[in-house]
């Protein structure tokens, strides 16, 4: 029982590390954020009252 829980914790910790290590000044990351917001406004905006960001 301890082994699956330990593996889950290791996986979650590694994913958190990847999320925190993202370079948010990278031009590719900035462009992907702009593309995501544009997609959100076009597809989800009317359903969320025009809001797409958290």
Curated annotation (Swiss-Prot):
One of its GO terms (molecular function) is hormone activity. Disulfide bonds join 40-52. This is Ductus ejaculatorius peptide 99B. Glycans are attached at residue 25. To paragonial peptide B. It comes from Drosophila melanogaster. InterPro entries: Sex_peptide (IPR012608). GO terms for biological process: egg-laying behavior; G protein-coupled receptor signaling pathway; negative regulation of female receptivity; negative regulation of female receptivity, post-mating; regulation of egg-laying behavior; sexual reproduction. Induces post-mating responses; increased oviposition and reduced receptivity. Residues 53-54 form a propeptide. The modification Pyrrolidone carboxylic acid is found at residue 22. Coiled coil: none annotated.
């Amino acid at each position: 029982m301890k082994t699956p829980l330990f593996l889950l914790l290791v996986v979650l910790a590694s994913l958190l590390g990847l999320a925190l290590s993202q370079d948010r000044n990278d031009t590719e990351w900035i462009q992907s954020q702009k593309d995501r917001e544009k997609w959100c406004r076009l597809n989800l905006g009317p359903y969320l009252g025009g809001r797409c960001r958290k």
